[in-house]
């Protein structure tokens, strides 16, 4: 039952109800209709995020604060299709355990990327495509920046 699609929410509100219920396996949610995932897991107490790495994010435009203050979140999201993504401000801010930086994301359409990560992050650990797309405000707060290929 792990990879069986059971739920197909039509909007963010329906998706939020599903993700707030820890008895619902994230593998079982088809997110292909969702355009807005902003604050979806903000301050979430959920401990099991298995299956989120397989979500269909091809229509998502907004992931603002999606994992902000989600202290247990730490999944590899490199498989996500981010080609339509425009907003990622505060996306991983204060997600204290998160360290699987998405280095394969398409960020060509990003318009807003304020404080995506915590202020004390070691920017040298970020992939080059994320370094280039972060706003000056993020860079100004970080120390010892060394951008290399």
Regions found by a protein language model. Give the residues of each.
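Negatively charged
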Residues: 1-149
């Amino acid at each position: 039952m792990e990879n069986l699609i059971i739920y197909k929410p039509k909007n963010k509100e329906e998706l939020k109800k599903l993700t707030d219920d820890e008895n619902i396996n994230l593998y079982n949610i088809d997110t292909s209709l969702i355009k807005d995932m902003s604050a979806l897991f903000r301050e979430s107490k959920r401990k099991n995020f298995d299956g989120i790495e397989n979500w269909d994010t091809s229509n998502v435009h907004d992931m603002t604060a999606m994992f902000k203050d989600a202290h247990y979140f730490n999944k590899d999201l490199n498989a996500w299709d981010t080609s339509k993504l425009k907003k990622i401000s505060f996306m991983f801010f204060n997600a204290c355990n998160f360290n699987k930086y998405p280095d394969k994301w398409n960020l060509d359409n990003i318009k807003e990327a304020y404080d995506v990560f915590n202020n004390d992050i070691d920017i040298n650990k970020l992939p080059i495509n994320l370094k280039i797309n972060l706003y000056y405000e993020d860079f100004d707060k970080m120390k010892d920046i060394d951008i290399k290929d």
